[in-house]
């Protein structure tokens, strides 16, 4: 399931994030990549424990917690510490790859299964050329380039890449979610069911039918969830 999440960051959040990034200590993004990813990764990335990365990560997680769409789509159990990257100049692309299945959070050593990937855009589309997040799915190749503050969710199993940035700079926050429901097909079914229930309630109010369907939703979640 590929899903756009609008306005995860407010204009005030974005202004604060950009101010934090002015003097940020950028490092080679390949330093945090595995052996295979190193061969295709060419960008800059903030150390996870620097002030700018921590502050922006806190803003992003706060925005996610306020997003009903994120909560129902991702069904989050754990959120990997958000990272910040930059594509510009010679360090301007990330070739085709699939994210590692398990990531370990620095400091705590806690492991996170990467069921869902998420990118929050920090730059406006007009600020740079190229830089599309390109995701291969069952419907073909999807090219994603969203307004600043918007996010995209997609399965962690997806083959994806970031196209070369040929002008300007592309700033983004990225992270992974371990879901209560690890299977993409099951998450999609639960998401579709929840969205349909919301629409039924808006159009017809609560009824015996919506109560029964809500029960079915929770019984499926109970069957599939890993807490």
Curated annotation (Swiss-Prot):
Positions with a binding annotation for Fe cation: 97, 99, 160
Gene Ontology MF annotations: 2-oxoglutarate-dependent dioxygenase activity; iron ion binding; L-ascorbic acid binding
Cofactor(s) annotated in UniProt: Fe(2+); L-ascorbate
Residues engaged in binding 2-oxoglutarate: 170
GO biological process terms, semicolon-separated: DNA damage response; intracellular iron ion homeostasis
Keywords from the UniProt entry: Dioxygenase, Iron, Metal-binding, Oxidoreductase, Vitamin C
SMART domains: P4Hc
The keyword Magnesium belongs to this UniProt entry's keyword annotation: no
Coiled-coil residue spans: none
Enzyme class: oxidoreductase
Pfam families cross-referenced by the UniProt entry: 2OG-FeII_Oxy_3 (PF13640), PKHD_C (PF18331)
PROSITE patterns for this protein: FE2OG_OXY
Note describing how the cofactor binds: Binds 1 Fe(2+) ion per subunit.
InterPro entries, alphabetized: Oxoglu/Fe-dep_dioxygenase_dom, PKHD_C, PKHD_hydroxylase, Pro_4_hyd_alph, Pro_4_hyd_alph_FE2OG_OXY
Taxonomy, superkingdom: Bacteria
EC identifiers of the protein: 1.14.11.-
All copies of domain Fe2OG dioxygenase, residue ranges: 78-179
Protein name as catalogued: PKHD-type hydroxylase Bpro_3048
Species this chain originates from: Polaromonas sp. (strain JS666 / ATCC BAA-500)
